[in-house]
Amino acid sequence: MALSVPPIAGAIIGYFTNDLAITMLFRPYKPIKIGQRTLPFTPGLIPANQERLARRISDAIMGSLLTPEELQKLTRRLLQTERVQAAIQWLLKMALDQVQSETEQKSAQVLAHILHDLLGSAIPRLIRVWARREDFLEAQLNQIFDQVLLELKLSEEQAGRIADWLLQVVLPPDRLRQTLIDFLTDRNIQVIDEDLREKTSGTYWVVANLFGVRNTLIRLRDFCIEEREACNVRLAELMDALGVRQRLIEGLQDLSLQNLPVATVRQLRKVFRQNVRIYIQSQGLELVKGLSDSLNWEHVSLSILNRLRSSTAVTASLEVVSQELALVLERYLERDLEIIVEKAIPILNLDEVIVERVKATTPQELEAAIQGIVKSELQAIVTLGGVLGLLIGIAQSVLLLVQGGL
């Protein structure tokens, strides 16, 4: 019986030594005082030196685990192109959803202010500067001239409306009658009569010299003056008989810049560009400002936002934009990652974060954590302690047995 005590005692002591040692490191958690004196070894070793322990843990982690090189590796793994692209795409979608949410009115107001400032202030100043250049909008204005003005031709309906306007407003019968009266003055009649007598030949000379046109023109003038209504009717019938309206329609339809000589067209194109440039230089600023002030920018902004909401192109472009931004960020990190990490470490202040976290952890929590690690990961050491205690106890029993035999 006496020989069995040392192995059993050794096994028990060896098995529970680790738990006892850990407990002694932490217990008691608070200092024990008798009167004004504090008992030695209170509180436990770790609670009494928790701040120094926290600093040592921080130095160990920052010195061997979270080195700048390791942080660079972590950053590279964290900022892989696929992850960055996914994050950027998520942010863009969130921004688009934010625009489409209940803050749409606020977004529209912000966009309205931006557009109003852009069109009402920034763009006019830029246009005024650009308009001083000789080649300002040269290609665009040439394209407008060649594809719009040069190709411009009236349709039959348009030509008919213009012809009706000319015959009813510009040249009605009454105005033609008045024009004839104003034209057939005594002097003009005399000049016409003399020219016909002098410059005609053949049958026309005989008629001009025997009968003359003076009396005929005077009678025509008197008829226009005295018989106003009848003259207007006769002129209308004459114009209808001569097919003036149809001739005007045909003439208007044939009217085109393409029928002009090439040199004339080129000169017209040049004049068109110059006039547009001069107009923009002199009145372009006021024109754009007036246009900007006349627009309801908030309504325009709402229309733009609604268009973005329903636009499949915007949604489809998010992936492309996020991919391009991710590639740009990747190239930037490849070049300056080391510098960024060096600047980020003092900003992050990781060592102080570790110290504060360790200091904020109570001794009870630290003890429970270490006990958990020992039981789950270091159980073999506990078992080994029991085995060693058992072996030492057996050795003592053997030694006692030998001594007793002697």
Curated annotation (Swiss-Prot):
Disulfide bonds: none annotated. It is a single-pass membrane protein. It is found in: Cell inner membrane. The chain crosses the membrane at residues 381-401. Keywords: Cell inner membrane, Cell membrane, Membrane, Transmembrane, Transmembrane helix. It comes from the Bacteria. GO terms for cellular component: plasma membrane. The keyword Membrane applies. Its main location: membrane. PANTHER family: UPF0754 MEMBRANE PROTEIN YHEB. Belongs to the UPF0754 family. This is UPF0754 membrane protein Cyan7425_4067. It comes from Cyanothece sp. (strain PCC 7425 / ATCC 29141).
